[in-house]
Amino acid sequence: MKLLAKAPLNLLRAFEAAGRTGAFALAASELELSPSAISHAIRKLENLLDVRLFQRSTREITLTKEGEILLEHIQRGFNELQQGLALVTADESRPLRLHTAPSFAHQWLLPRLGKFIRENPSIDLRLSASTEYARFEQDDFDLDIVYGEPRPSPYEKIPLAVEELTPLCSPQLAERLKKPEDLYALTLIQCDVQLYQWKGWFEANKMTPPNNYGLRFDRSFMAIAAAVDGLGVVLESKLLAEREIASGKLVCPLVNSTSEIHYIGHYLVFPQHQHMHSALDVFKTWLLNELNLGKIR
């Protein structure tokens, strides 16, 4: 306890945030402090412990070997502390705070949300969507549905459905799309933040990618909406476009004549201590069942 008395919690929080984010500025933004305050706190911690925790240069900071060891143990301790707080404050009315990728929320989750609410009327679900990663350390969120492979972290991650990317278009436009080569004469809609894009699809099908695309968006739900309106052919996930395909607003004209791209597009991420949150377990089970992944826990 003598060593712990040397290191106040505010200094440990500043160090943990800086070590995890790799930048004083990012840690400062997260903790709502100034970068100089973060730097001062870490310098004070180093002096108190008589250990150098960071190597500093004009452009970056990197953890020393001692810093890496301390960061691992502090994060483990914070998780234990969070778990203890959850145990003594457990409450049926505690909200479940979900963060998710925008297009997954808009295209897949929202159409099913009514079913979840009807089945679980006592759960206070609060939903937020952005392309940023959820912040668990400040207790902002309980779980996160992220697009793409999550960054390295101590959190649990569950891969969600294997998604299939295929050209999609309106039934009217499909009349002009009988073979893969017909794509060259049509407007191609591209989502610029997508992991796999038209170039990769053309190469997978041993075709030369075109030099230009007609429309570009930074969200899949906008690209899908443009295709529904007949503005072009979009390369998109059949999972995200499930509702439009089922209703006949979009069709897959080349699905039997081309090689499609398969990949794990989304992951469920949450801290281990959140196992103590009963509503999280209910939502996780429901989500996996809806994705036909009920055997994964």
From Swiss-Prot:
Residue ranges of DNA binding: 24-44
GO biological process: DNA-templated transcription
Alphabetical list of PROSITE patterns matching this protein: HTH_LYSR (PS50931)
Keyword line: DNA-binding, Transcription, Transcription regulation
Pfam families per the UniProt record, alphabetical: HTH_1, LysR_substrate
SUPFAM superfamilies in the record: Periplasmic binding protein-like II, Winged helix' DNA-binding domain
InterPro entries linked to this entry: LysR_subst-bd, Tscrpt_reg_HTH_LysR, WH-like_DNA-bd_sf, WH_DNA-bd_sf
Gene Ontology MF, one: identical protein binding
Gene3D superfamilies: Periplasmic binding protein-like II, Winged helix-like DNA-binding domain superfamily/Winged helix DNA-binding domain
Span of domain HTH lysR-type: 7-64
Keyword Transcription: yes
Transcription listed as a keyword: yes
Family label: Belongs to the LysR transcriptional regulatory family.
Role played: Apparent regulatory gene involved in peroxide resistance in stationary phase.
Protein name stated in the entry: HTH-type transcriptional regulator PerR
